[in-house]
A protein has these predicted regions:
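Proline/serine/threonine-rich low-complexity linkers at boundaries of modular beta-sandwich domains
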Residues: 13-25
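Well-ordered beta-strand positions in beta-sheet-rich domains
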Residues: 25, 70, 82, 108-112
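Extended, polar beta-sheet/loop recognition surfaces of beta-rich domains
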Residues: 34-36, 40-47, 104-117
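Surface-exposed loops/turns
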Residues: 30, 36-37, 89-90
Length: 117
């Protein structure tokens, strides 16, 4: 029995070491429609992030980058990244992210959100 418990602890530990940072939640939400322009995009990941080698970009429908290029890590939550936005007009916006977790694994993805006015 003791051997099985030690094996489980070892396997769980290895799984944690091999963890990747995946999108856990975003604000604005993935595929969401919101009434007015958000002031920023916030993405929380499943693992802590290395902000110096990570990115979040926001593009309008024409492909122009519209974020303020001021990506920063949340002071109290090192799995949460923010990027500021100017006042956005009505339309569909694409968020493209690429992050490196503290264990050096790279993940990336994208999603859209829609602003009504």
């Amino acid at each position: 029995m003791k051997g099985i418990i030690l094996l489980l602890i070892f396997v769980v530990g290895l799984a944690r070491l091999e963890a990747h940072a995946f999108l856990e939640r975003a604000d604005p939400g993935v595929g969401s429609t919101i009434q007015t322009s958000p002031s920023e995009v916030r993405i929380r990941f499943t693992e802590n992030i290395e902000p110096a080698v990570s990115s979040i970009q926001v593009f309008d429908a024409s492909g122009k980058e519209v974020d303020k290029r001021d990506l920063h890590l949340d002071r109290s939550d090192h799995a949460l990244l923010h990027v500021s936005l100017p006042q956005l007009g009505a339309g569909i916006y694409k968020v493209v992210w690429r992050v490196v977790s503290v264990d050096t694994h790279v993940t990336s993805g994208n999603f859209t959100f829609r602003v009504l006015r």
